[in-house]
Amino acid sequence: MRFYIFIYFFLFVFSCKQFKPKTEEVKNVKPRLDSLFFEPSKKPIEKKPLISKLELNLIEKGLVNVQDLDSSILIDIKYSSTDNFMQEDMYGNFNKAYLQKNVAEKVVKAQQFLKEINPELSLLIYDAVRPRHIQQKMWNALDMPISEKIKFVSNPKNGSLHNFGAAVDLTLASLTGEALDMGTAFDYIGELAYPTLEMQNLKAGLLTQKQIENRKLLRKVMYQAGFFNIQTEWWHFNSCYRKEARELYDIVE
């Protein structure tokens, strides 16, 4: 009897050792792709930008997004930030450069002319169409005589060419978006921004030759494309005169 008990005990111990999974074998087991513990993707969900009411209104009026015509043109809409003379975000979630179609096509031509001269440079747009109610806020904010005020902001009663989508504020920049030195910042209110006083400011040591050359290059490509500048802002270019704009376009309120 003892002999049979010993045999059963021996077989039991031997069978446990034989079928016990090895530690190394367990470690090497790879999880299946359909495992309940499969790690979810960490890729962020892309949020589609909302189209503002202003942009919908511009599209209905026939204006176009400049970057839809030429995506190489750089955009930094200053009134969609606090980096402007108002120090206020005037446009909210609208941060695109919309212009009348024929005006936008001129900007594209200016970009092409610039690329022919220097492919390492690009136009950088600061402002394009501007609703008249924004123009009114700017007009009200400038505390100076009207004779001085009209040098920097058009009277909203008459309508600025920006209000028609027929003017653009811009500069030159590297392909990384770094603006070239023009001697003043955008929206600088003062004679240092006057194209008509550049040589005078050069002689006075207030502008450098390089800064003036940068301005001249900007004017050159814009002139070639059919724009003309104004006397008090190196960054501002008109596509036509106000009388023509009234005949051709609806003002953006």
How should each PLM-predicted stretch be described?
Residues 132-138, 237-244:
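Beta-rich nucleic-acid/ligand-interaction surfaces
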Residues 14-15:
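C-terminal motif of bacterial Sec signal peptides marking the signal peptidase cleavage site
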Residues 19-128, 141, 145-232, 241-253:
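Extracytoplasmic cell-surface/polysaccharide-interacting catalytic and binding patches
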Residues 1-5:
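Positively charged n-region of N-terminal signal peptides that target proteins for export
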